[in-house]
């Protein structure tokens, strides 16, 4: 999300689109789409950040060495992009890390209680809108209807980025089975070699359902436990459906989700 070539191309494309259809009333963006934040300033449109709180700037002294190195590299890249497009960076934090920070509005799909330990770092442009369970729009899949309605299910997923850890899936499924739960293991669309796929199947309990994807509205109402990586979307879904979570974080904001779930 900080590739100067790709970000620059994105800014140009969004600017051209605004020229064609007119300046939008606002640009609503993912918290990591640098091009959208730059383009919003360039065309003079307010930026709304979707799915991320507005927080105070990080203190460089609190960063690890490798974080400081990456932060300096990020600042240098952003300064070159500002100069290229004649911008000042109104939609970015000016501290140690140049994260996207709208002065107008950040929408969080959690609530203030979820961020109670971080309350002192939240900025007033954060609006908590919470969330509600979605109702299924279609019939449940056949594999799910074949599981008895009173059978306890453990949903096991590592999202889309970290889905290649075969040992993790096997260990979680074995633990769930020993606890009397039926493991539903969701591995995403990660490409496994035939050997790795066979090894995974051999390591799973015989009661396991192994899938690429599941519909949360169908499976979560029947789930007794979800074991996952702490991704924001998975964590949020488990919360709104009231499913107990066992979180094993890997990277990014996952440590924070695990900490908040424990609190």
What are the roles of these predicted feature ranges?
Residues 65-68, 201-205, 246, 263:
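Short, hinge-like loop/turn segments at secondary-structure boundaries
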Residues 59-60, 195-196, 239, 257-258:
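Short Asp/Glu-rich motifs
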Residues 53, 189-190, 251:
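Residues in the short beta-alpha loop(s) of Rossmann-like NAD(P)-binding domains
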Residues 1-153, 158-182, 195:
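Nucleotide-sugar-dependent glycosyltransferase catalytic domains
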Residues 171-209:
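Catalytic donor nucleotide-activated moiety binding site of glycosyltransferases and closely related
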């Amino acid at each position: 999300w900080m590739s100067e070539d790709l970000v620059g191309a994105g800014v140009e494309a969004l600017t051209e689109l605004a020229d064609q259809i007119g300046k939008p009333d606002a640009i609503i963006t993912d918290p990591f789409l640098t091009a959208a934040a730059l383009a919003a300033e360039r065309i003079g449109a307010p930026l709304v950040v979707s799915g991320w709180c507005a927080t105070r700037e990080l203190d460089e002294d609190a960063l690890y060495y490798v974080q400081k190195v990456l932060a300096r590299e990020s600042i240098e890249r952003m300064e070159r992009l500002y100069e290229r497009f004649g911008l000042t960076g109104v939609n970015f934090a000016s501290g140690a890390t140049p994260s996207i920070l709208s002065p107008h509005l950040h929408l969080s799909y959690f609530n203030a209680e979820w961020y109670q330990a971080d309350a002192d770092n939240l900025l007033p442009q954060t609006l908590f809108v919470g969330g509600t369970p979605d109702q299924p729009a279609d019939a449940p899949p056949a594999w799910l209807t074949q599981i008895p309605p009173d059978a306890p299910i453990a949903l096991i997923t590592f999202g889309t980025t970290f889905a290649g850890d075969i040992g993790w899936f096997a260990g979680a499924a074995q633990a769930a089975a020993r606890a009397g739960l039926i493991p539903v293991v969701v591995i995403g669309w990660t490409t496994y070699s035939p050997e790795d796929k066979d090894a995974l199947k051999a390591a799973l309990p015989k009661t396991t359902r192994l899938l690429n994807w599941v519909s949360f509205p169908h499976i979560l109402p029947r789930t007794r436990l979800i074991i996952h990586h702490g991704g924001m979307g998975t964590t949020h879904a488990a919360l709104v459906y009231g499913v107990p979570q066992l979180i094993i974080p890997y990277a990014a904001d996952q440590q924070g989700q695990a900490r908040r779930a424990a609190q």
